[in-house]
């Protein structure tokens, strides 16, 4: 049985708790991340080395489960989750582009990362929490990965930048910027001017 480890830190004044050694113990690693009542679970599994492959077979899937928000989708009889939404695809790509470059270029071992949203409180966004959980999960394996990755979401309102904004704060924000990096790996943003970005401070 894996030893339970709990780590808590603050980001933008909001407390984030990472827990490992509790669930999915057959995986290489599993990290549960909580911010408020938003909870995600990131699991990492890997297969034996396959030298015949000419690429790195990394697959990453971000899943927003319907039960996380207390929703039931579809007709009276169809209650299962459907194909990935645009949001799930975009978040999966964001996490993938943050994590993939930190593996060795010639690495050929198949790796699967699945991040499942278990609970959503309506205020704390699961997407950023998912990226943090995925980074922590990979970092706690024995895989040759040059992480961890830091992830932060930025909003902008009334001339001030908001670190780790809530859903309600983001609804009134002029900026939706996600930065994931060890130094600088990936930036994803919506609705901002170049002048606004140039004046931002990321210290």
Residue ranges and their predicted role:
Residues 1-25, 30-31:
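Short, Gly/Pro- and small/polar-rich lid/capping loops
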Residues 98, 129-141:
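Stable alpha-helical structural segments in soluble proteins, enriched in small hydrophobic residues
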């Amino acid at each position: 049985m894996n030893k339970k480890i709990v780590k808590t830190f603050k980001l933008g004044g909001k407390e984030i708790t990472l827990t490992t050694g509790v669930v999915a113990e057959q995986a290489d690693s599993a990290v549960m991340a909580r911010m408020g009542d938003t909870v995600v679970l990131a699991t990492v599994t890997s297969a034996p080395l396959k030298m015949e492959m000419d690429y790195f077979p990394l697959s990453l899937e971000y899943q927003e489960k319907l039960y996380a928000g207390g929703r039931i989708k579809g007709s009276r009889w169809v209650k299962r989750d459907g194909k990935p939404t645009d949001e799930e695809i975009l978040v999966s790509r964001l996490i993938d582009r943050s994590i993939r470059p930190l593996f060795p270029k010639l690495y050929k071992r198949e790796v699967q990362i699945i991040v499942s949203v278990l609970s959503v409180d309506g205020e704390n966004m699961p997407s950023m929490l998912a990226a943090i959980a995925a980074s922590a999960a990979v970092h706690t394996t024995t895989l040759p990965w040059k992480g961890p990755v830091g992830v932060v979401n930025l909003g902008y309102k009334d001339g001030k930048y908001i670190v780790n904004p809530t859903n309600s704060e983001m609804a009134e924000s002029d900026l939706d910027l996600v930065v994931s990096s060890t130094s600088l790996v990936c930036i994803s943003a919506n609705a901002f001017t170049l002048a606004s970005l140039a004046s931002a401070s990321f210290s």
